[in-house]
């Protein structure tokens, strides 16, 4: 018992500096934001009432949720395919998959966003090639809209969806899959009826991680959306630095943080923190 308490005390002492940093760097400033949401420009609940009546704010919230949902579905599906190859493929396939997973981390989000602008713009590589081969006569609108935002965000978030899936797949007992095959199940049926259900915790974890990250995206929607597909993080920036309407911007921030906090609590009901690494 003493050894157990000693270990717990040692762990608490090691975590104390980090917890202090989090309180000073995040919790304390956030309390200031909460205060602004109730006091600027006048004390009261006026800013939160505005969230329920301002059609612009409501449309941005809906757009953010819609884009986040689409990005989550596409990212998890793509990440699942990549993870299957990474975990259960041949050595060469694993190297290629690992390369695809790690390379995006070497490039900044700003560089990637401008790279997609170069690819998707009217005179970009994709439109130029499609016109050259005769598939289209006029350039397609692939950027400065929701499509461009979804492409850029999906490209950024796929690697983050891989790790919970990989942890879930590595924990599978191959004997269960062999038993299914031995009972006459085809490869495809074994995959959909046995393999996929057994990795459901990884799917849920990946989906929640991607969805939470999507809600707070700023740089990618600002560049690829071109001001036409404003998401909630960009709206907060505009309200605080351009309007300026600090009270409403603070209220939107508080609602976003509480919503993300609820999603994170839901996340850790389905996946252990160690599964994320």
Question: Which role does the model predict for each range below?
Answer:
Residues 42-53, 227-239:
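Short hydrophobic, aromatic-rich alpha-helical segments embedded in or entering the lipid bilayer
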Residues 1-6:
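Short, Lys/Arg-rich, polar N-terminal cytosolic tail immediately upstream
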Residues 180:
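The alpha-helix within a helix-turn-helix
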Residues 7-41, 55-170, 194-198, 202-218, ...:
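Membrane-water interface segments at the C-terminal ends of transmembrane alpha-helices
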Residues 270-277:
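Short cytosolic juxtamembrane segments of multi-pass membrane proteins
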Residues 183-184, 197:
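Glycine/proline-centered hinge or cleavage motifs at structural transition points of membrane proteins
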Residues 172-176:
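Active-site loop immediately N-terminal to the catalytic Tyr-X3-Lys motif
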């Amino acid at each position: 018992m003493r050894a157990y308490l000693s270990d717990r005390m040692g762990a608490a002492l090691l975590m104390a500096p980090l917890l202090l940093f989090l309180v000073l760097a995040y919790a304390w400033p956030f309390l200031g934001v909460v205060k602004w949401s109730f006091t600027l420009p006048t004390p009261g609940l006026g800013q939160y009432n505005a969230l329920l009546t301002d059609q612009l704010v409501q449309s941005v919230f809906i757009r953010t949720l819609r884009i986040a949902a689409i990005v989550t579905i596409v990212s998890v599906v793509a990440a699942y395919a990549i993870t299957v190859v990474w975990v259960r493929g041949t050595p060469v396939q694993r190297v290629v998959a690992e390369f695809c997973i790690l390379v995006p981390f070497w490039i900044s989000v700003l560089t990637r966003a401008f790279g997609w602008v170069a690819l998707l713009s009217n005179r970009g590589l994709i439109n130029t090639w499609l016109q050259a081969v005769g598939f289209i006569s006029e350039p397609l609108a692939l950027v400065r809209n929701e499509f461009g935002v979804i492409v850029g965000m999906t490209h950024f978030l796929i690697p983050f969806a891989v790790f919970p899936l990989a942890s879930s797949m590595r924990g599978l007992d191959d004997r269960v899959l062999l038993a299914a095959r031995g009972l006459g199940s085809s490869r495809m049926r074994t995959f959909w009826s046995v393999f996929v259900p057994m990795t459901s915790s990884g799917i849920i974890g990946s989906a929640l991680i991607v969805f939470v990250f999507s809600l707070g995206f700023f740089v990618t929607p600002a560049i690829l959306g071109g001001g036409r597909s404003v998401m909630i993080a960009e709206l907060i920036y505009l309200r605080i630095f351009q309007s300026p309407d600090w009270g409403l911007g603070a209220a939107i921030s508080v609602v976003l943080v509480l919503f993300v906090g609820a999603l994170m609590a839901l996340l850790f009901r389905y996946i252990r923190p160690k599964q994320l690494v």
